[in-house]
Design a protein with these regions (language model features):
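Conserved, well-ordered alpha-helix/loop/beta-strand core segments that scaffold catalytic motifs
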Residues: 15-42
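Alpha-amylase-like alpha-glycosidases and glucanotransferases acting on alpha-linked glucans and related
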Residues: 1-18, 42-185
Length: 185
């Protein structure tokens, strides 16, 4: 019952926020101001996304990530960055027609006009670090969904030009550039 009260409280707070946000957005649009949001590729382990859709993430039966996200050593950090976000089960997400990703993007686009994709390079390939590692030096690159996700997204959103802006930090390979250029992000 305490959880139910907490859930109800957050539902009311979110309802009020979104109602107020819509008024802000309408005021911006009336002045021809577009709003840009931010969408990180990975979600937090303790997020509602992971809680509600555990099967879409690389977790063991008790819900602990089997591998986590980060980036290898680079000019920002000699030991890389160990973010700790669970990796996706891209195979299951693909089988669903990328439904979860489509819904995620639709949700953010209900709130903003354009979206900066944080760690865009992860859609081409992302750094996967074994559970328990203390640095990101021990990871490996794993293939992401690439162009297929963005093609499906274009169809689902009914647009020729996706309203996304790709972040280009980190290890940007020719394949990442080709993906970004192909979709003009």
């Amino acid at each position: 019952t305490r959880c139910l009260r907490d859930i109800r409280l957050h539902q009311v707070i979110q309802f009020l926020f979104f109602e107020q946000w819509q008024r802000v957005r309408d005021a911006c649009h009336s002045r021809r101001i577009a709003i840009m949001g931010d969408l990180p590729i990975f979600v937090a382990h303790d997020s509602a996304d992971v809680w509600a859709r555990r099967e879409l993430f690389r977790l063991d039966p008790d819900g602990t990530p089997t591998v986590v996200a980060g980036v290898p050593p680079d000019y920002f950090s000699a030991t890389g960055q160990l973010w700790g976000n669970p990796h996706y089960r891209w195979d299951l997400i693909e089988r669903s027609g990328y439904a979860w990703w489509i819904e995620r993007c639709r949700s953010v686009l209900d709130q903003v006009d354009r979206v900066r994709i944080d760690h865009f390079r992860g859609f081409e390939g992302s750094w996967e670090i074994p559970r328990g590692a203390t640095t990101a030096m021990v990871g490996e690159w794993v293939k992401g969904p690439g162009a297929q996700l963005f093609e499906v997204m274009q169809c689902a959103l009914g647009v020729d030009q996706l309203p996304f802006v790709a972040e280009n930090l980190g290890v940007i390979t020719p394949e990442v550039e080709a993906l970004r250029e192909h979709f003009r992000l």
